[in-house]
Amino acid sequence: MAKQDVIEMEGTVVESLPNAMFRVELDNSFNILAHISGKIRRNYIKILPGDRVKVELTPYDLTKGRITYRLRK
């Protein structure tokens, strides 16, 4: 998947699920299921419910995404 094929959006983590999965509510009020990117996992960045995050979505499946950045409060 090329970098220009992704859709970047911001949202809020609603719920933490097993296996490093999170339910994220996007700014347009859609709920998606997102997992953590490798760089966040490698740098031990904690993501908790209530955190603002940047999410990448593919145009093929808009219900799943990848958390790429945790925004500052």
Curated annotation (Swiss-Prot):
Output the SUPFAM superfamilies linked to this UniProt entry: Nucleic acid-binding proteins (SSF50249)
Protein biosynthesis listed as a keyword: yes
Keywords recorded for this protein, A-Z: Cytoplasm, Initiation factor, Protein biosynthesis, RNA-binding, rRNA-binding
Q: List the disulfide bonds.
A: none
Ranges for domain S1-like? 1-72
Per the entry, what this protein does is:
One of the essential components for the initiation of protein synthesis. Stabilizes the binding of IF-2 and IF-3 on the 30S subunit to which N-formylmethionyl-tRNA(fMet) subsequently binds. Helps modulate mRNA selection, yielding the 30S pre-initiation complex (PIC). Upon addition of the 50S ribosomal subunit IF-1, IF-2 and IF-3 are released leaving the mature 70S translation initiation complex.
Q: What is this protein called?
A: Translation initiation factor IF-1
